[in-house]
């Protein structure tokens, strides 16, 4: 990548970019501008016009109008504006609105998706609003909403046009833009007050939603998702699936988190007053309409938790023929576009002790009845129980992701105080969990679940479970050795009776922690043990790898987990194997102190691992998770720089420095261009771009110092490059282009983060120039998230993008400020914003010359 500046486009010019990390190559004319000026400009993405995704913009006012929850999009297609579509014979009501926007200094302030060439919702060719940019013209006006469908731009019909045609229409609409949009008519509500009396099965209903866990995209409300047989809600008969909970007793449920709603419901007395909103419009069998309030839930699966003779639980399942679900949040394929990604799957909570049937499926995808079904619980379930003071616990289970249509059923398992049967089949990793306990009759507890192991995949065990028996062998009073022997000799199929005991386990953990602290203090005071303290040494380091204390079996005392990029205050580095440390937080040192592996220990284990990999693995083999085989199995997620086998990344000595400039930002890896787009669009007052240099002659419409710094002498620019005055430079069509240190400094000293589109080599050059950038690497988890976030990528393109990212980490891993991972673009974007906020200064940690 030869150009560092991240800039917007003029309407008649394409942005120059050698290569987008997650899209096709663009070898168009190199033409960068400094900033967007005048109403004729629109901030667009980096791709060719035919590939442009977004129409971003903003106005200069600081007031941001609050965005209201938008109705969910619907799968319809209207041939004309006069035709009202029908879904399954039911009329769907729309409202139409003409919205006039005055284009701000940089555009209209919203993003779009869809078109005849890339439908956003099903087969609907419409152009849909996917994002309202805070502070932009659309947000200030307040009328345009996410999921609005644009039918006309001024006098141009865009109801059935390609994506690029819609973008072109918006770009050429002038400074005053009239949008004619269609949206689904809002659902009217009737507010009802319901008085419930808690019975032996609690309140007897399930909820979903809340701030940060939206059940319906754009809506933070708490919704009823299931009515439990025999519960108070079913006996009363008025509460229905799809009802919106407004108040519980005197507590409002508007704009609360899911956990807050659960806590409010849990802490109620025997008499509970609910205020609920009921939808007054019924959409019959429209799967995209609101809930059908005529039924508590869809026809149930024959899916029961049965009580065994000994009080344990047996699982039994049979499936009825598939029929469309009565209520469905937005299906996955409706949220597929580059700028907007779906929120995380919502958490569901059950307000009763034990569900006799699983929660109703959220939606069905079209499948043949003879296909196999995926039976899993992708969401944590909270069971609020039989007893008023029963504990609320969570349980989650992994579900297998598949790109093919599948049916997901929810399974409710009681984890509170009731013994339950768990059947596991040993795999190559054994049973996949660790145990602790067995002293003084305190019991045997599950302390760790190995990711991907049999226990993890079953979802039936969790940390804090007490193991009561194994294949009929009573372990309630067993020692640790007896329990380990019973599990080891249990054969391939192991039947476990487990009971969730979070309070007992917490007391046990506290006891162990105290014992470890005593051992630590004794070894330090006596000079014996595994920690030698002949010469106490203190320093600050930046972690260059991830460390999980729960996976390190060699710990002599309480460990301290950390992530790549964390700053650690090493209090005692005198021991060859183990150091004592605290994690440094914004306000100083963390209270938590623990043991971490020393630099020597990390490097020794990594070299041993590399020898094993070279012996066992084929050259260049990388597994589906992007890890070299064997990496991190013992908790050490260390890395070795490619081509530098002697340089193993462990810890980097750092020192704290005060800066008087705003740090440049370099984002590397897949999706970096979209993250850069959103940062500049959402925070135009905080992020900017610099003006590049070129030896190309100036064109008539260009302004020196705004579009480029035009260098008269090629010899002079070559001399400046040799003198390291440029962080990155290259040649295109016999002309030199590059970004100078001075251009970056100009932006940084004026209080803006300079967004730089550069290679990893520029990080070190900026550090040498005393402009320490915030360098964030976006590390893909696997191919699947890449293809989910960019639906246009083929598997081959995704593989190339993935491989480029792995090489990028191997080459420049030592220079990254942070590494972020996520399943959605929104998740990655939020993590990047958090890193930038935390690393902005004025006090930052920079590499020091101290030797470890």
From Swiss-Prot:
<dbReference type="InterPro" id="IPR001478">
    <property type="entry name" value="PDZ"/>
</dbReference>
<keyword id="KW-0966">Cell projection</keyword>
<feature type="domain" description="SH3">
    <location>
        <begin position="536"/>
        <end position="606"/>
    </location>
</feature>
<dbReference type="GO" id="GO:0045197">
    <property type="term" value="P:establishment or maintenance of epithelial cell apical/basal polarity"/>
</dbReference>
<dbReference type="GO" id="GO:0030425">
    <property type="term" value="C:dendrite"/>
</dbReference>
<dbReference type="GO" id="GO:0007399">
    <property type="term" value="P:nervous system development"/>
</dbReference>
<feature type="modified residue" description="Phosphoserine">
    <location>
        <position position="328"/>
    </location>
</feature>
<dbReference type="GO" id="GO:0007268">
    <property type="term" value="P:chemical synaptic transmission"/>
</dbReference>
<dbReference type="GO" id="GO:0030054">
    <property type="term" value="C:cell junction"/>
</dbReference>
<keyword id="KW-0472">Membrane</keyword>
<dbReference type="InterPro" id="IPR016313">
    <property type="entry name" value="DLG1-like"/>
</dbReference>
<keyword id="KW-0564">Palmitate</keyword>
<feature type="domain" description="PDZ 2">
    <location>
        <begin position="193"/>
        <end position="279"/>
    </location>
</feature>
<feature type="domain" description="PDZ 1">
    <location>
        <begin position="98"/>
        <end position="184"/>
    </location>
</feature>
<dbReference type="GO" id="GO:0099072">
    <property type="term" value="P:regulation of postsynaptic membrane neurotransmitter receptor levels"/>
</dbReference>
<dbReference type="GO" id="GO:0035255">
    <property type="term" value="F:ionotropic glutamate receptor binding"/>
</dbReference>
<dbReference type="GO" id="GO:0043204">
    <property type="term" value="C:perikaryon"/>
</dbReference>
<dbReference type="GO" id="GO:0043005">
    <property type="term" value="C:neuron projection"/>
</dbReference>
<dbReference type="GO" id="GO:0098839">
    <property type="term" value="C:postsynaptic density membrane"/>
</dbReference>
<feature type="domain" description="PDZ 3">
    <location>
        <begin position="421"/>
        <end position="501"/>
    </location>
</feature>
<feature type="lipid moiety-binding region" description="S-palmitoyl cysteine">
    <location>
        <position position="7"/>
    </location>
</feature>
<dbReference type="GO" id="GO:0099641">
    <property type="term" value="P:anterograde axonal protein transport"/>
</dbReference>
<dbReference type="Pfam" id="PF00018">
    <property type="entry name" value="SH3_1"/>
</dbReference>
<feature type="modified residue" description="Phosphoserine">
    <location>
        <position position="414"/>
    </location>
</feature>
<dbReference type="Pfam" id="PF00595">
    <property type="entry name" value="PDZ"/>
</dbReference>
<feature type="modified residue" description="Phosphoserine">
    <location>
        <position position="65"/>
    </location>
</feature>
<dbReference type="GO" id="GO:1904115">
    <property type="term" value="C:axon cytoplasm"/>
</dbReference>
<dbReference type="Pfam" id="PF00625">
    <property type="entry name" value="Guanylate_kin"/>
</dbReference>
<dbReference type="InterPro" id="IPR008145">
    <property type="entry name" value="GK/Ca_channel_bsu"/>
</dbReference>
<dbReference type="GO" id="GO:0014069">
    <property type="term" value="C:postsynaptic density"/>
</dbReference>
<dbReference type="GO" id="GO:0099642">
    <property type="term" value="P:retrograde axonal protein transport"/>
</dbReference>
<dbReference type="GO" id="GO:0016323">
    <property type="term" value="C:basolateral plasma membrane"/>
</dbReference>
<dbReference type="GO" id="GO:0097120">
    <property type="term" value="P:receptor localization to synapse"/>
</dbReference>
<dbReference type="InterPro" id="IPR001452">
    <property type="entry name" value="SH3_domain"/>
</dbReference>
<dbReference type="GO" id="GO:0045163">
    <property type="term" value="P:clustering of voltage-gated potassium channels"/>
</dbReference>
<dbReference type="InterPro" id="IPR019583">
    <property type="entry name" value="DLG1-4_PDZ_assoc"/>
</dbReference>
<keyword id="KW-0449">Lipoprotein</keyword>
<keyword id="KW-0728">SH3 domain</keyword>
<feature type="modified residue" description="Phosphoserine">
    <location>
        <position position="553"/>
    </location>
</feature>
<dbReference type="GO" id="GO:0045161">
    <property type="term" value="P:neuronal ion channel clustering"/>
</dbReference>
<dbReference type="Pfam" id="PF10608">
    <property type="entry name" value="MAGUK_N_PEST"/>
</dbReference>
<comment type="similarity">
    <text>Belongs to the MAGUK family.</text>
</comment>
């Amino acid at each position: 990548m030869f150009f560092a500046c991240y800039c917007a486009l003029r309407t008649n010019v394409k942005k120059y970019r050698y290569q987008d990390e997650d899209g096709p190559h663009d070898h168009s004319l190199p033409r960068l501008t400094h900033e967007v000026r005048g109403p004729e400009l629109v901030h667009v993405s980096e791709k060719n016009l035919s590939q442009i995704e977004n129409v971003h913009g903003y106005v200069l006012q600081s007031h941001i109008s609050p965005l209201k929850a938008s109705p969910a999009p619907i799968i319809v297609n209207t041939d004309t504006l006069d035709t009202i579509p029908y879904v399954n014979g039911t009329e769907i009501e729309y409202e139409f609105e003409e919205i006039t926007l005055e284009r701000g200094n940089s555009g209209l302030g919203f993003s779009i998706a869809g078109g005849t060439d890339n439908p956003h919702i099903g087969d609907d060719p419409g152009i849909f609003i996917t994002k309202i940019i805070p502070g932009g013209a659309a947000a200030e006006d307040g009328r345009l909403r996410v999921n609005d469908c644009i039918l006309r731009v001024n006098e141009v019909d865009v109801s059935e046009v390609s994506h690029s045609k819609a973008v072109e229409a918006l770009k050429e609409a002038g400074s005053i833009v009239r949008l004619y949009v269609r949206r689904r008519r809002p659902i009217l509500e009737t507010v009802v007050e319901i008085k419930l009396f808690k019975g032996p099965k609690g309140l007897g209903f399930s909820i979903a939603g809340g701030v940060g866990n939206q059940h319906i995209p754009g809506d933070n409300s708490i919704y009823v998702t299931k009515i439990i047989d025999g519960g108070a809600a079913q006996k009363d008969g008025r509460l229905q699936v799809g009802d919106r909970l407004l108040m519980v007793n005197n507590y409002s449920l508007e704009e609360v988190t899911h956990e807050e709603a659960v806590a409010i419901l849990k802490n109620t007395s025997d008499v509970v007053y609910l205020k609920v909103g009921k939808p007054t419009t019924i959409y019959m069998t429209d799967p995209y309409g609101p809930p059908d309030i005529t039924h508590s839930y869809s026809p149930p699966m024959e899916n029961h938790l049965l009580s065994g003779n000994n009080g344990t639980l047996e699982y039994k399942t049979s499936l009825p023929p598939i029929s469309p679900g009565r209520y469905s949040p937005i299906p996955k394929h409706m949220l597929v576009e580059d700028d907007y990604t779906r929120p995380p799957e919502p958490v569901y909570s059950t307000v009763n002790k034990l569900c006799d049937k699983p929660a109703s499926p959220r939606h069905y995808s079209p499948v043949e009845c003879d296909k196999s079904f995926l039976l899993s619980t992708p969401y944590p379930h909270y069971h609020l129980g039989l007893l008023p003071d029963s504990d609320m616990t969570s349980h989650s289970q992994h579900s297998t992701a598949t790109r093919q249509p599948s049916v997901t059923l929810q399974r409710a398992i009681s984890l509170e105080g009731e013994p339950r049967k768990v059947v596991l089949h040993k795999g190559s990793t054994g049973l996949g969990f660790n145990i602790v306990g067995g002293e003084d009759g305190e019991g045997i507890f599950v302390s760790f679940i190995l990711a991907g192991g049999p226990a993890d995949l079953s979802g039936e065990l969790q940390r804090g479970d007490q193991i009561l028996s194994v294949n009929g062998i009573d372990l309630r009073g067993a020692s640790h050795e007896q329990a380990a022997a019973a599990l080891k000799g249990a054969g391939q199929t192991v039947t476990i009776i487990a009971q969730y005991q979070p309070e007992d386990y917490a007391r046990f953990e506290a006891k162990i922690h105290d014992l470890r602290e005593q051992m630590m203090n004794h070894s330090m005071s006596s000079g014996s043990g595994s920690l030698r303290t002949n010469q106490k040494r203190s320093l600050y380091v930046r972690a260059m790898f991830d460390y999980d204390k729960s996976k390190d079996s060699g710990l002599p005392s309480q460990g301290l987990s950390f992530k790549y990029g964390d700053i650690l205050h090493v209090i005692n580095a005198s021991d060859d194997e183990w150091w004592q440390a605290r994690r440094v937080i914004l306000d100083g040192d963390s209270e938590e102190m623990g043991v971490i592996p020393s630099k020597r220990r990390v490097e020794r284990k990594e070299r041993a691992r590399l020898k094993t990999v070279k012996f066992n693995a084929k050259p260049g083999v990388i597994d589906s998770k992007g890890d070299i085989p064997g990496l991190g199995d013992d908790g050490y997620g260390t890395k070795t720089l490619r081509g530098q086998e002697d340089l193993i990344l462990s810890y980097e000595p750092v020192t704290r420095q005060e800066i008087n400039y705003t740090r440049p930002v370099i984002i590397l890896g897949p999706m970096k261009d979209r993250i850069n787009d959103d940062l500049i669009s959402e925070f135009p007052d905080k992020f900017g771009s610099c003006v590049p240099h070129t030896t190309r002659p100036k064109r008539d419409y260009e302004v020196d110092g705004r579009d480029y710094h035009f260098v008269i002498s090629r010899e002079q620019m070559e001399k400046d490059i040799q003198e390291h005055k440029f962080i990155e430079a290259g040649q295109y069509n016999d002309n030199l282009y590059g970004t100078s240190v001075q251009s970056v400094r100009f932006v940084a000293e004026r209080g803006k983060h300079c967004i730089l589109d550069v290679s990893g080599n520029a990080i070190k050059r900026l550090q040498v120039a005393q402009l320490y950038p915030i360098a964030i690497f976006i590390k893909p988890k696997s191919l699947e998230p890449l293809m989910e976030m960019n639906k246009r990528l083929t598997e081959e393109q995704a593989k190339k993008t993935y491989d480029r990212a792995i090489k990028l980490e191997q080459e420049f891993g030592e220079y990254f400020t942070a590494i972020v991972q996520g399943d959605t673009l929104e998740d990655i974007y939020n993590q990047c914003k958090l890193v930038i906020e935390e690393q902005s200064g004025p006090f930052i940690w920079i590499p020091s010359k101290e030797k470890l």
